Amino acid sequence: MAEEKVLEVKNLHVNFHTYAGDVKAIRNVSFDLEKGQTLAIVGESGSGKSVTTKTLMGLNAKNAEIPEGELLFKGRNLLDLKEEEWQKIRGNEISMIFQDPMTSLDPTMRIGKQIAEPLLKHNKGMSKADAMKRALELMQQVGIPDAEVHINDYPHQWSGGMRQRAVIAIALAADPEILIADEPTTALDVTIQAQIMHMMAELQERINSSIVFITHDLGVVAGFAHKVAVMYAGEIVEYGTVEEIFYNPQHPYTWGLLDSMPTVDSSVDRLVSIPGTPPDLLNPPKGDAFAARNKFALAIDFEEEPPYFEVSPTHFAKTWLLDPRAPKVTPSDNILARWKRWEELKGDK
């Protein structure tokens, strides 16, 4: 049975006009988001992750241009909406959790009132008393202890982890169908990160919302996401289920991300990094954007952009290494071990 799609992104392109020229920040990005599922978008800084999510919220800067693409939500192309139409959807049907809770909260407003604010905005008949009652319930749902005592606190009185819980409560206030989380745990320590991720998974199951989770850290999404899109230089270079990306990765950039992840049982003395820097998107390179950093690059990588090769019906990668004519290459021992584990997983099914 096919999953219900709540969002379809098709051939999205986003440019930014600058004095130096047009920055081609997003190039031909497509993906689907299914009901109750989590899609993780992973990549280095500057890969286009945050621009993608801001486009989904209609929050790009004024110098942004979208020359091509569709964002289909409930049969409507969000790119056709006027700002007043966006305001009915933003924070209501589609909500966002931002990276830094301190800059997301108004330091001069009590936290309970900030949580109640979107309720009053999107429910015109709701009284302030009912909104505050619901705000208290939301604070309890996101695990804020003694919520009734702290509902009138100001943001500076709370720790970073508690502030992030408040931001999540605000995002969940209207029971959104889609929740976009832009690196929501980056500013938190590892223990609090795990608590926030666990809480978000529980809340998702309870309200059956769909999540787009942005991160630069593949390790964060291992036990949380259903599907993963790996972004590089404004493009999705690999897309698959979380198991396919972790245990059967096919793109050299994905290999590099996985090799740079620390693991508890690793015998490696030092972490591996991906050499070089991402390309200048004012003038994207000819061919494969990752070619200059790819030690497995073929001659064709510098001349012709690769298509998406199908690895499975749910798994695609944009690399010439998957062309039947390409030579076989040997990635790191880490990737070979993952491939071996993939064969074992397939055998268990």
From Swiss-Prot:
Cellular compartment(s): Cell membrane
GO cellular component: plasma membrane
Reaction equation(s) it catalyzes: a dipeptide(out) + ATP + H2O = a dipeptide(in) + ADP + phosphate + H(+)
Main location: membrane
EC assignment: 7.4.2.9
Enzyme class: translocase
Membrane topology: Peripheral membrane protein
Keyword Protein transport: yes
Subunit structure: The complex is composed of two ATP-binding proteins (DppD and DppF), two transmembrane proteins (DppB and DppC) and a solute-binding protein (DppA).
Family: Belongs to the ABC transporter superfamily.
Name recorded for this polypeptide: Dipeptide transport ATP-binding protein DppD
Organism encoding this protein: Lactococcus lactis subsp. cremoris (strain MG1363)
